[in-house]
Amino acid sequence: MEFHTFGDEDNKKVLLLHGMLCDWKKFRDLLKPLEESYYVIYPAMTGCYDGSADFVSFTDECAHIEDYVTENLDGKLDAVWGASQGATVLTELLARNRIKVQTEILDGVYLAHQGRLAASLGLRAFLKMQKNGGRISKVMQNVCKLMGLQNEDLAEFSLMYWGASASSMKANLIENYTYQINEAIRDSETKVHLWCGSREPYAMKSHKMLKKYLRNYTEKIWPDVGHGVMMYFHTDEYLDAIRAIVR
């Protein structure tokens, strides 16, 4: 994992974690205005940048974040935000409770099981897309339909990092589709904001699962949109929603 920082170090410290097999730089292009108000830390997940080792697990990614925050930020963050798989990783970070996080925003978190079959189908589709320069195959379209995604939701594929190895892709997909909630999350005192679109059935199922454990949370369902649509197509409104939370 690599870490990239921008903004005034005297401002609130906000960590922004990208989605599965995505390019942190493309997420920064959308989220960059936040750097005017916050000291922003963008991790690049293992396997998702040139010269990286292969991705192994969510726990490894959490350990990298914990080590960085402990060594560079006195073990504390004012807020963390994660999209899709980034949000899922942050649920594990919360459960581990090894650094202090005041506020957590989970957008499109996926914890409802889709299983190894979905991971296998996804791997085939990702490898084909990688070979075809990122074009969305029919297999991937079918996988996305199983996830409740529609055509506008597929814009998030433009944020992908296509240099990932087959090993990293496989490990990512297996983790993403088989990860189970770490029940230690019930001990966290962090304020958690659950976000998703009204057309995200798996994310909404995941919210229901998390509510059984979280002590302190709010829920925001964006009307008539799917996975990643608010960030990608309604960026200004989306950033304002983040600013309203992280004051």
Model-derived features: positions:
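Conserved HGGG/HGGXW glycine-rich cap/lid loop of the alpha/beta-hydrolase fold
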Residues: T5-D50
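Active-site loop/oxyanion-hole signature of alpha/beta-hydrolase fold enzymes
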Residues: I41-A79
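Gly/Ala-rich beta-loop-alpha elbow adjacent to hydrolase catalytic centers
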Residues: W81-L90
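Flexible "cap/lid" loop of the alpha/beta hydrolase fold
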Residues: A95-R96, V101-N132
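Conserved alpha/beta-hydrolase catalytic His-Asp/Glu region
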Residues: G115-L117, G133-R186
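Short beta-strand/loop motif that positions the catalytic acidic residue
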Residues: S188, L194-C196
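Acidic catalytic loop of the alpha/beta-hydrolase fold
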Residues: S198-A203, G228
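Catalytic histidine-centered segment of alpha/beta-hydrolase-like enzymes
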Residues: V225-D236
